[in-house]
Design a protein with these regions (language model features):
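Extracellular polysaccharide-degrading/modifying enzymes targeting complex plant/algal/animal polysaccharides
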Residues: 1-189, 194, 199-201, 207-210, ...
């Protein structure tokens, strides 16, 4: 592969064995970037360093990280809402604020963003963000729009090698061991993968995952060690070790 791409990669098939694998590799001397984000423009100035952007929910193509909240076993939200979305200025992410007021009240702390969104397809998602001393329409501002950047749609895509990429900026969900684990890059419960010499960064929750078979016991551990052990036992019973 050469150059940069903003699109996620979904491998359609796997290799036949460890000696007959499919390899995804960046071309020698090329910097190939795969992102889960898109550049956004059209920011409107609100006050001081605060800017606002409104987008139709259709922009997100069925998955809206600013309506998607982080939750699951072993996650403590500390009394606030966390989203899988993110806002990036020149490649670096801002911090999600606890409320619109937290963004409107400028401070010397890390720049914040905040979003409001409804679930309807015809609705609007509005983002507010602090860009200290910067016009976001003259800089590169990106937002998360995809849950992963390299992840099979189905399990059993075996014997892949992924090498030499920059993979970044994905709206990954919380990944407890008791639920399906979707990473910025992940095998989706497939075997024989080699992931090497890649830069993996700016993932909301997790970078690399093995995955998990989905079943009726997802997120039902009640935060117990026994729940974790039973997750492993069920995987072995389903033939993972064969």
């Amino acid at each position: 592969m050469k150059g940069s791409t903003g699109n996620a990669s979904i491998p359609p098939r796997g290799g036949l064995s460890g000696n007959q694998r499919i390899t995804y590799r960046a071309a020698l001397g090329e910097r190939v970037v795969i992102k889960g984000s898109e550049v956004v423009t059209g920011w409107e100035h609100v006050i001081d360093d605060v800017w606002k952007l409104s987008l139709p929910n259709r922009f997100f193509n069925g998955f809206n990280p600013y309506h998607d909240t982080i939750s699951g076993d072993w996650f403590n939200p500390l009394g606030r809402t966390h989203h899988t979305g993110a806002v990036y200025l020149d490649g670096h992410w801002l911090t999600e604020g606890t409320s619109l007021e937290s963004v409107m009240n400028s401070s010397d702390a890390e720049p914040l963003w905040y979003a409001e969104s409804d679930a309807s397809e015809e609705g609007i998602t509005t983002l507010w963000a602090q860009f200290p001393g910067v016009d976001p329409n003259e800089s590169e501002v990106e937002i998360n729009v995809r849950q992963s950047v390299f992840y099979p749609e189905k399990t059993g895509i075996t014997y892949l090698t992924i090498c030499g990429f920059v993979m970044e900026q994905a709206a990954t969900p919380w990944a407890p061991p008791t639920a399906e684990q979707i990473g910025l890059i992940g095998s989706n419960w497939s075997r024989g993968w080699i992931i090497e010499n890649n830069t993996i960064r700016y993932s909301t929750c997790v970078g690399i995952t093995l995955g998990k078979h989905g079943d009726a016991f997802d997120n039902t551990s009640q935060n117990s060690a026994e729940g974790y052990v039973q997750t492993i036992k069920r995987a072995l019973d389903l033939g993972w070790s064969e």
